Amino acid sequence: YFESIKNKSNDDFIKKWHEFTKNPKRTTNDPMEAHVIGFAMWVKAVEKVKSTDPDKVIDALPGTEVPNLTGGTSKMLPNHHITKPVFIGEVKGDGQFNVVWKTPGLVPGDAWSNYLPDSKDLEADWVTLKCGNYNKLTKKCGGSS
């Protein structure tokens, strides 16, 4: 996420942020966009299950899609990570970014790296496996004996 990405949803968010902070130079950042996405997903899940019961909301989150601030949508995956576009930018003189490359579509978030020895055999799947660190070799959820 870059504040300098131009579209209506991002422009509206930045305007509200500047009004809230009473500082037109205050910048936004990726963790702020993540909060916007996460809260919108939580609201949608609460509305779906008509409850704020944490277990019901958690079960309703996978598959939830909401707009992101870069002009597309983000989706909650069974591993409780989301899809997002990836941007590479170069810094401008004002500290903002020019986008020099972006993914053609959304990139799925992954809970575990396939490249690290300690995590390459782990899988997160809260829908089917009900586990965030399932070992595909031992067929056990982390923490269980």
Walk through the language-model features, giving the residues of each.
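Extracytosolic ligand-binding ectodomains
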Residues: 1-145
